Regions:
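Conserved catalytic-core motifs of GNAT/GCN5-like acyltransferases
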Residues: 1-5, 144-159
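Conserved acyl-donor/pantetheine-binding loop and adjacent beta-alpha core of acyl/acetyltransferases
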Residues: 45, 49-53, 57-89, 93
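Conserved active-site alpha-helix within GNAT-family acetyltransferase domains
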Residues: 129-149
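Short low-complexity, flexible loop/linker segments enriched in glycine and/or proline
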Residues: 160-164
């Protein structure tokens, strides 16, 4: 699973305007539950545990959502969890509704979150290997891929870093993972 980061002060690429696009932190638990196909109880639990839900709109239609974790993050498929240090945010559980894909909503939602979460200096995000749409949207939003989770025999073994930058090392520290290889 490739991991990317964006740090406050990094440039954000200019994205062409998308008419009527808006995105904001949401308190509408019913709408979030409907979009994410989760119970309102699950949405409330996420919010109470330090997760911020964002919804993107075109006109008044909700078209995408995503979450920012500020206390604890995790990758449920790997049974992996981690504590998030202050001034860091982990971006997770994003979805653009199928009928709205291919319009550049995802990178705009990521940038909107960066603009609105002013208390976060370092944003972290991962995506499934082979998910080229996510990889493209994350890159287009201005994130840099710095490492890849190393999984063998169904277990998370550590992190392979892409290069020797301070950000690559910071990713190992953020996720509390050993460095098992460099690429």
């Amino acid at each position: 699973m490739p991991l990317g980061t964006w740090w406050r002060g990094d440039p954000l690429p200019d994205l062409s305007p998308l008419q009527t696009f808006s995105a904001s932190l949401s308190t509408d638990t019913q709408m979030i539950a409907r979009l994410a196909n989760l119970s309102e109880q699950e949405i409330n639990t996420r919010i109470q545990t330090g997760n911020h839900p964002y919804i993107a709109f075109l006109d008044d239609a909700p078209v995408a959502y995503g979450w920012v974790a500020l206390r604890e993050g995790g990758i449920s498929e790997l049974q992996f969890s981690f504590t998030i240090p202050p001034r860091n945010g982990y971006l997770w559980d994003f979805l653009t509704l199928p009928q709205w894909r291919g319009r550049g909503i995802y990178p705009r939602l990521l940038q909107a979150i960066i603009h609105q979460e002013q208390l976060v200096d370092h944003f972290w995000i991962g995506y499934q290997p082979g998910n080229e749409a996510s990889a493209h949207g994350i890159n287009k939003a201005g994130f840099h891929v710095v490492g890849d989770l190393v999984i063998s025999e169904g277990r998370l073994r550590g992190l392979a870093l892409f290069g020797s930058s301070g950000r690559a090392q910071a990713s190992a520290d953020f996720f509390h993972l050993p460095i098992v290889a460099g690429k």
